[in-house]
Amino acid sequence: MTGLSSPGDALLRFEPLTEGVLLKRYKRFLADVELSSGETVTAHCANTGPMTGVLIPGQRVRLRYAPSPKRKLAWTWEQAEVPGADGQHCWVGINTALPNRLIRATVEAGCLEAQLGAIARIRAEVAYGTNKRSRIDLLLTPAEQNPDQRPIYLEVKNTTWTDGSTALFPDTVTERGQKHLIELMGVLPDARAVLVPCLSRPDVTAFAPGDSADPRYGELFRQATNSGVEVLPCCFSFSADAVHWQGTRLVDLG
């Protein structure tokens, strides 16, 4: 893995996104956006959840333009501007396809070496769980110098909902998320199990389970942490051409 990155460093860079204004989001996967040119385009919305607190018609948004014969839509909705907990507006990453890639880059940059130790290998979407019917987001192999040689199972959760300066997950009932917690507990004690909330906005100081949205998830979350599942909230900020590392955040169990 590469050298350590400091808060504010760019972990991912990309071609500058195109800014516009959100007109509406509909059919879960679609969003109409008016570009600065006055043109209205339809963008793919990878986030099919309720997007609580970050879906605001009339807000500024950023889109990625990537035409392809394999894609029905050339535009993808990547970021949204929202009122932040600090009273300032901030940009939120809303593309649920990004967090796994982002957390992988975070590990590769050495940002989590203090928590995870040195890592020799990263594999994605490895089968595990009951009858190996699930896939873990990232499976890490410790380097030889890592004092804990157990494999590390990382489950990543994109997190955009907030209550003040606390990030919350989930923002709706998620039976899939409940199952992931149970399966993380299942790899203990022969492996390390780490839940990584990907805090896709820079204005948060802590993470907590979204008890009001999914009480059962909150119960399982506390059971998991009591059983030895580690929780490692990772915070990021977003610009028009990069995602920046902002460090880890505290876990608040209330």
UniProtKB/Swiss-Prot annotation:
Xref: InterPro entries: SfsA (IPR005224), SfsA_C (IPR040452), SfsA_N (IPR041465)
Coiled-coil features, chain-numbered ranges: none
A GO molecular-function descriptor: DNA binding
Residue stretches spanning the membrane: none
Pfam families attached to this UniProt entry: SfsA, SfsA_N
Similarity section: Belongs to the SfsA family.
Name of this protein: Sugar fermentation stimulation protein homolog
Taxonomic source organism: Synechococcus sp. (strain CC9605)
Upper taxonomic lineage: Bacteria, Bacillati, Cyanobacteriota, Cyanophyceae, Synechococcales
